[in-house]
Design a protein with these regions (language model features):
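The feature marks the mature, well-folded catalytic cores of soluble enzymes
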Residues: 1-166
């Protein structure tokens, strides 16, 4: 995605660790925003190494928003969809997904033969979303965010282009 922009420098946000991960995989100069994901930032490389010692043969799959020591201690790092694909295609006997723990629950449903080790870091912001709240928003048409047509069109183009690139 970064290289498809046709520039030699990109301002990358919102996550500093993801920017560092992307920088290692491109020649484009990345200028990163110093934000992080509070869930991924809680994990440590030592924690991953300890889990590997306690669970011989476990495959550790990390999200690139994790700190570099976590990525280094992992067997695979990739986007959320890449993590899901990795589990589905490789069917490891035992796996640790280094990301928000609800994701492990969802992936486990689709991969019942895989044992998931879950050091649970929950995202308090994701937990604010409930089925009842979604139902109320749809039923009452509340909490709508309105943006201008021009901004919506630019955002739509960006999202479609990103999906096209992969």
């Amino acid at each position: 995605v970064v290289e498809s922009l046709g520039t030699d420098k990109v301002i990358f946000l919102p996550d500093h660790y993801l920017a560092n991960y992307v920088q290692k995989n491109t020649k484009v100069k990345i200028i990163s925003w110093q934000g992080t994901c509070m869930v991924h930032e809680k994990f440590t490389g030592k924690e991953v190494e300890d889990i590997k010692k306690e669970n011989p043969g476990i495959e550790v799959i990390a999200h690139p928003e994790c700190p570099p020591d976590v990525i280094s201690a992992s067997d695979f790092a990739g986007s959320t969809s890449s993590m899901v694909k990795y589990v589905k295609e490789n069917q490891p006997k035992k796996v640790l997904l280094v990301t928000e723990c609800t994701m492990s629950d969802n992936v486990q449903v689709e991969n019942p033969n895989v044992q998931f080790i879950k050091p649970c870091n929950l995202c308090p912001h994701m937990k604010k979303i409930t089925l009842n709240k979604i139902y109320d928003c749809l039923k009452n048409e509340t909490n709508e965010i309105k943006i201008g047509h021009n901004i919506a069109e630019m955002a739509r183009k960006s999202v479609l282009r990103m999906a096209e690139i992969g």
